């Protein structure tokens, strides 16, 4: 089994081999090392990310294990309460989702009945979901003629003498609860089909839920510490035995991983006496250090670990940064060299426990020397980038592309006086994220050639992006940028699917789409009904000139870093759902998808195998490579 995986890794440069490798990753986690000896844990959820960061054919496969884990994500965002919008029809009134729909009904009826309006103004009414309490209030104000009557009771002839009574249709709706509809006209009323929606767009559009990105960039921190976790191979999988820090201590324990971690956490707590947040800086820590510690994380230790964040029970926070994501693919020694510190080797990971014990004294010293070099390089790089990308600071970002693009967008925004905003509320963020589709759309299975957009940067830098806070609109305005909750109906004829949906048996579904994706889908024959949208009246102009200026500035500082950064920006948009430029990523991905579809339109559909926002698989038998395809690169 191990030999088979080792061979697959050495030849994992084509789609078929990678798919076979994925099958093994459903059962095992691959233990690998790079040329510098740094451990890397490869599992089914992170292999794509690893392949985007490095050439996996150059990794050394050490073993397979089931005794490991993935990064522990932050607690999931609670599901938002499903939403029904208000419907005021000539035959009925259905209030929007509310804890007190009966109160909404009586307030709506007061628009027609002045005596109800006067009583509400004089006396007010307490919130209640009880019909008997509503009727008691009406009776006490001399308004018993408007008493609330359930539709079923009215039909039993029990209340026919009350000609002015408020007849309500009572129901229970899943994930919402009790709901009532005021029946205005019994002769024409039929219970309506009401869309139960995943988002309340009006609520999401509230001004206080949106913050200008520039106001979130000027942050300070007190302390930075370089850190590295070393792991040895045991019968039960990889085991951490040493945690080194600089400046700081080295912790070693071959007998109890729990004690190793607790000693490290006690030391962290001691140095946080004067600050609530510190920064730990590792190298490839997201690929080895953090997931390895997560496996052994002690219960009831006073700290929780979520991805790269440690949070203590008293609210102290440790951000564990991965400097590799700011290196543009450089090895640790090259990174240190390029940022002016002396490159030093580090102890190898994933060695036998007995070898680690035998060499521990020399490896403690070697680890400290390597960490000192990493610390100095990181401090130099962060200082330089914070000048060039002011006011962005490295510790506020998870990778260099995000920092670079944020600085460009902020600069353009400030120069034009039109800032980009981002959502601060979990539900608002989830709505925006829901419009982002990174999945492959499968058309058919056939032997195919893979093509990728030649320059993502060229496509996205010439487009427009939202500026200012959004407004709520029922339907988006043509020519403006907006994100809408949509009811989508797929075409009845043969078609290339454009809007991703994971249920092939459903022809109508509700999803979130950008105005760019709506235009693309409509062109492809989809029927789309907009159920509410966030719309922006202003746009940030083209980013191209500012992008080029920023690239030149970084190039003058460090040509190797800039070339690698530029290559990453050209090849990919690494979407980051925690980014403050979430809106930029949303529309950038839509623009790329629209470009891919414009190419699909020029090709006979029988040759299309699958596609994503940046890649297109075309049948190997297709020979008519047209001029449009010149903007794609064959992989």
UniProtKB/Swiss-Prot annotation:
GO annotations of cellular component type: host cell; host cell endosome; membrane; virion membrane
Induction remarks: Expressed in the early phase of the viral replicative cycle.
Any single Pfam family the record assigns to this protein: Pox_F12L
GO terms of biological process kind: microtubule-dependent intracellular transport of viral material towards cell periphery
Keyword Membrane in record: yes
Record bears the keyword Metal-binding: no
Subcellular location: Virion membrane; Host endosome
Disulphide-bridged cysteine pairs: none
Keyword line: Early protein, Host endosome, Host-virus interaction, Late protein, Membrane, Microtubular outwards viral transport, Viral release from host cell, Virion, Virulence
The family this protein is said to belong to: Belongs to the orthopoxvirus OPG056 family.
Summary of subunit composition and partner proteins: Interacts with protein OPG164. Interacts with protein OPG064.
Protein function: Plays a role in intracellular enveloped virus (IEV) transport to the cell surface through microtubule transport. Together with protein OPG064, forms a complex that interacts with host KLC2 (kinesin light chain isoform 2) to engage the kinesin-1 complex and thereby promote IEV trafficking.
Name of the protein in question: Protein OPG056
Organism: Camelpox virus (strain M-96)
